[in-house]
Amino acid sequence: MAKLTESMTNVLEGDSMDQDVESPVAIHQPKLPKQARDDLPRHISRDRTKRKIQRYVRKDGKCNVHHGNVRETYRYLTDIFTTLVDLKWRFNLLIFVMVYTVTWLFFGMIWWLIAYIRGDMDHIEDPSWTPCVTNLNGFVSAFLFSIETETTIGYGYRVITDKCPEGIILLLIQSVLGSIVNAFMVGCMFVKISQPKKRAETLVFSTHAVISMRDGKLCLMFRVGDLRNSHIVEASIRAKLIKSKQTSEGEFIPLNQTDINVGYYTGDDRLSLVSPLIISHEINQQSPFWEISKAQLPKEELEIVVILEGMVEATGMTCQARSSYITSEILWGYRFTPVLTLEDGFYEVDYNSFHETYETSTPSLSAKELAELASRAELPLSWSVSSKLNQHAELETEEEEKNLEEQTERNGDVANLENESKV
């Protein structure tokens, strides 16, 4: 009984060493994202503007995401062609040279073994002996014959004879495998050379996005341009808002993606990128910027990712260019400087002013607050809110002046009546 009690006590107290040995399953707590660990609980740190915003997509278009703890690495080998194409140039060239060198050495060794087993090495000076390959007297000559066979050079000094069936079979195998290696490696190099990644470097985005009034509506705008004379065919643009989100159930979504409408329903997202264009997003009730004002914008932790896609006119391959804007790169109350001018018989684009902006009169209220003010004043939203507010202020000033004049006239009438009564 005492032993049973002692054993139960040990189980309840928990011997860590015994648990490590006997427990077959290790329970791992889920690891929260770093941003979730920083934000929970939220009331601990309210000053979120001092933290540096981590980019999801860098300005040069590269995604700032690293894949770690990938255990199923065999999946990269199942798609070996894409894996080789995605490698850096130095590794790609190294593999290119190594593959050819290894195949030449491998088949050169087999040719030497055939000659050695047949005894050709012992009858080099015997004119009556018919070797498998003439003038093959060592491993170096076998290696050279392997290169000549696979690359179909055929100098004619070393020739296979018809008295060697195993050599004929090896010749067929090396010819077929050599063609496969050539097709694979040359195709890999061709695809890597013809990739349109470099074409995306001549597609430029403005360094800043701006928010200002356009046609009486508050809009978010950025500019895109193409530096080449050969154009992008079927160009289209998309924009997404990357922002952390916490659901009503308490779930934290660190990189929640929300679509930003840049003309999908009207067809304005289809671009003719002959000259730089300003892409506009109307801030309405469906916009994620509906409730964001000028004062609130610097406090937001968000990122706008813009994606420009199209086909390269010269090759017909699909090209994609990316960029992003964080809150510090969104200017409220600014517009882009015009870059297109009419010269003698042609239009000229001045890319020196491509990134330049100038300040303009823009309400500091959010689009929601502007809509509420417009509805109270019974003004249609399509009108210029700022101008209508100015007109409303002018009307109030005119009414005050009229009231003042009427009051002055009344005071004058009263004074005249008093004078007449005295008389």
From Swiss-Prot:
Pfam families: IRK, IRK_C. The chain crosses the membrane at residues 90-114, 167-188. Activated by phosphatidylinositol 4,5 biphosphate (PtdIns(4,5)P2). It is a multi-pass membrane protein. One of its GO terms (biological process) is regulation of monoatomic ion transmembrane transport. The record marks 182 as: Role in the control of polyamine-mediated channel gating and in the blocking by intracellular magnesium. SUPFAM superfamilies: E set domains, Voltage-gated potassium channels. It comes from Pongo abelii (Sumatran orangutan). Belongs to the inward rectifier-type potassium channel (TC 1.A.2.1) family. KCNJ6 subfamily. This is G protein-activated inward rectifier potassium channel 2. A motif (Selectivity filter) lies at residues 152-157. The gene is KCNJ6. One of its GO terms (cellular component) is monoatomic ion channel complex. It catalyses: K(+)(in) = K(+)(out). Residues 115-138, 158-166 are extracellular.
